């Protein structure tokens, strides 16, 4: 029996679902102090950088038909890749909890029955999504995405056409570089996941391009909704925006379905990454466990400001993908037969430290691009020096 492959349409739908998210709208609100013009420029520049990296990561996995964490072995070796598989599972558990928390908080603002109840509802729906499975979600996703698309159009209309409010004045509390970095961070957080989906595609390179473009456009749109809401309605609480818009139950559906379709990807990929750590584990079962942990964490811990979490993701995964790009596209080498590729691990550590240092420097293009350029340069030089020795 031939393996079922995903179409370009299905890949586009998956990444549309990833982009429509409460977390992205909330992150967009952080950019309001820049004002609309500068904020929009930062969103677009950040997403261009982030989605280009997303594309490269997806192409690597798609071409070799390997999951995201399996492709990491090509640069860091069998055991060396375990560090990133572990860090990836950790960030995905974090994202699962944050997404459920944000969704439940917003849902409770529309229909107040208690945040923990909404955490449970969203958690159960995510488990249902995992059980149905990615290749069987085609029709379910089409219905969910169509509804989300219409409802987010309504939300955009309410914010930009019906608010009637004068935009708030820009201030200096957010620099342009920091705004770019917050815009890079979202696509970058998907970077260790994209190959989990492109490896299943009939046409991996085309599917990767469509995935990166669809996600980039939708994510920009979510950021703009959040930023616009904060600027034009003076409201940072997404539930309040929806209530003021008269989007009671419809708004509730946006919140729940967008949370489920995005968080499903986090939990599913945590399961796939866990298989790289312990071969005997079943990815689907781990995904369900991750959802349960995320649901409990969302009930117990407050997770209102995620900027530090986003910067941490950037500092871990920007140098990682820089090394992968250098190895796959420039040096054309594969370390997957090795136990540990020590040189690349040292280069990654340098890249991680450089990113953390760049956080204290205000650069117009953010930290990710300079950090990746430095990491790739160090990687290529280290490779040449190693050969000469």
Language-model regions: role of each:
Residues 80-113, 260-276, 319:
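Hydrophobic transmembrane alpha-helices that form the core helical bundles
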Residues 171, 323-389:
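C-terminal membrane-solvent junction of multi-pass transporters and transport-like membrane proteins
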Residues 14-18, 84-89, 110-132, 145-156, ...:
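Transmembrane alpha-helical segments of multi-pass small-molecule transport proteins
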Residues 1-38, 136, 175-180, 192, ...:
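Membrane-interface "cap" regions at the ends of multi-pass membrane proteins
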Residues 117-159, 170-171, 208-215, 310-322, ...:
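Membrane-interface loop-to-helix entry segments
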Residues 29-58, 80-82, 215, 370, ...:
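Extracellular loop-to-transmembrane helix junctions
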Residues 44-76, 83-89, 383-387:
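Juxtamembrane transmembrane-helix boundary signature
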Residues 29-33, 59, 98, 102-110, ...:
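Membrane-water interface regions at transmembrane-helix termini and the short interhelical loops
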């Amino acid at each position: 029996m031939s393996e079922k492959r995903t179409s370009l349409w299905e890949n586009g739908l998956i990444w549309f679902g990833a982009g429509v998210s409460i977390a992205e709208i909330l992150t967009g609100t952080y950019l309001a102090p820049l004002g609309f013009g500068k904020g929009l420029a930062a969103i677009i520049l950040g997403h261009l950088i982030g989605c280009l990296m997303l594309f490269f990561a997806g192409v690597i996995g798609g071409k070799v038909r390997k999951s995201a964490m399996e492709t990491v072995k090509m640069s860091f070796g069998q055991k060396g890749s375990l560090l990133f598989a572990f860090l990836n599972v950790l960030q995905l558990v974090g994202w699962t909890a944050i997404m459920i928390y944000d969704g439940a908080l917003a849902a409770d603002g529309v229909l107040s029955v208690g945040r923990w109840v909404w955490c449970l509802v969203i958690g159960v729906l995510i488990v249902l999504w995992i059980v149905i499975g990615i290749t069987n979600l085609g029709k379910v996703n089409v219905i969910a995405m169509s509804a989300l698309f219409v409802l987010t159009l309504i939300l955009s209309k309410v914010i930009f056409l019906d608010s009637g409010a004068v935009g708030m004045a820009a201030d200096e509390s957010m620099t342009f570089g920091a705004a770019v970095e917050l815009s890079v961070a979202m696509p970058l957080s998907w970077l260790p996941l994209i190959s989990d989906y492109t490896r299943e595609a009939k046409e991996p390179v085309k599917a990767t391009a469509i995935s990166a473009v669809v996600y980039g456009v939708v994510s920009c749109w979510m950021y703009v909704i959040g930023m616009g809401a904060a600027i034009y309605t003076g409201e940072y609480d997404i539930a309040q925006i929806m209530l003021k818009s008269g989007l009671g139950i419809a708004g509730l559906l946006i919140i729940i379905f967008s949370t489920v379709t995005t968080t499903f990807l986090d939990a599913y990929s945590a399961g796939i990454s866990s298989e790289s750590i312990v071969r005997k584990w079943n990815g689907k079962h781990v995904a369900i466990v991750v959802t349960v942990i995320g649901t409990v964490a969302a009930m117990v811990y407050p997770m209102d400001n995620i900027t530090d979490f986003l910067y941490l993701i950037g500092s871990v995964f920007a140098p990682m993908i820089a090394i992968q790009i250098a190895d796959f596209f420039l040096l054309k080498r594969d370390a997957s037969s090795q136990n540990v590729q020590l040189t690349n691990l040292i280069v990654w550590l340098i890249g991680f430290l450089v990113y953390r240092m760049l956080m204290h420097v205000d650069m117009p293009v953010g930290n990710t691009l300079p950090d990746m350029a430095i990491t790739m340069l160090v990687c290529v030089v280290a490779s040449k020096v190693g050969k000469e020795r």
